[in-house]
């Protein structure tokens, strides 16, 4: 076996576009390429790729990486305008950070190069930039439950094209996907010296750097900063005139706003500040401090009837209530040339919006908050070229920005992406979805149908059906929340099944018309008759038998031959994580658990384990669309079976395989390509590799700049059955990434 590494020289010369990422001291390239409005943006990497023959003659191959075009799909926790025309930044809770590229009129990820080991750094807790040098970008990154809770400050001086890293784990705790993640910002730069940086932690209090973030020391605020809601210090702002620092602590019924006039060496509680609400955000305007309040830290637990907006005048030491209503608010922005003109948004309110969905309210004032106009009954909403959003609302509005160069323009975050309005002061403001380039879904499964579309299931928003990776599709019309599994009958490809749901919603659906209509099965397979939900599904090759291993069914497999009118429990097969049906013979079904590989030869009535195969972690059994009995399985390396799983042969060339997928081959001599997330023998780096000769030789198709945090929650790698050289991979919060081979 011959393995050829990526040539650093070729990469430097031939990488046409760069990806910005968050690894320490690495040069990355921007996720940027010319693209039509309805397609995803790609970035490129050049590799020496083995041709697959025994002579190991290589050919130069260009791989282009992008994200499958869904559009938004997750909570964007902060959005920011800069003084540079057309330059915006955004942060997300699980999908990294983005920069708006005005030349492409879309968002560009700056987080492609996060490794699987460091995938927690895709949770961005806070974002800051130097006011007069917006190329200097700072990201506070970390996720409590990933990467051993690693907390880091990621520092860039080139708009996020490259980053250096300062680890903060021993000083403070960061959790980009924690409650209160829409609060902010927890980073503040001294307006007169951007090398002086203050950061507030969920635990650990406040820390300060005087060398641009290279080193930090802890500050004593004279009060306990750890809070019952684990949100800690949630906002820091600095008065550019006086240099005074204000910090908010996420608590109520006690002092929660503190001030320092000596660079953080000493702190005092601000007298007269409201104590019965929690501070969400703070910002300076015209020498006064605007403070936004809600009953809890958010984004979804506020009681919706308590909150407001206060103006603090430090000269008079007075607070003035300018709330549009007694409701929880997320943010307020001020016209840069007229401090009397402001826009405010609620957070976690659910009232009618123009498209019929329920979400937050928007208000404007032109008299400094003496009176406010509600916009919900006069504004309009449009999809911005991403059609699935038409049935969704603008909600969880915890951050807004106003363009200092074009103050008619605002952007606001939502639980599903970013919305924008370019005429906010008009009588009929026009809001539109502004999320092209942002891909923040959490994918759980994807199926490439031969001569058909891509179908997927994701967290929160059901899933998508789309003609290809670069065209925005529509969500399944069942719109049933989080889905965990989907399968297609390979010989009857109009029949699909999927599962999701929860304790209150039946969790199995099927379609017999390729997703045009879905039927929700009401009958539970569980003996207790409790609602079954989530788990794994499969459908026989002929589409006549459905299989389901519900998450709350102890991993037992159930099958139905009457479309869910009745269910029968299979014998054998326990703690099941994945099910696959043979693509040709409807009698054969395969299942896996963390301890066993199971096969059935009687249509799922009984399953027996393969006692010869050691399985420690359950992965998907992968089948080809037209070959009976052939199974690819990631276990103790890469295993292949040609007899329905009775026996497996280990591929000697692979030392580690965490996920495996199959895709369309180049020609009849190589009908299928194998893709893995793993390590062939002789390779040191975990990554995406492919083989065109059934595993005899392998070549890496990604590099350190294209890691995407690894396969994430979905844990899948799949090839496309219609496009040669296209591979898909799930992520923890960057949607589904894909790579295309270009000769």
Question: PLM features: residue spans?
Answer:
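Extracellular glycan-interacting surfaces
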Residues: 2-5, 9, 20-34, 47-743
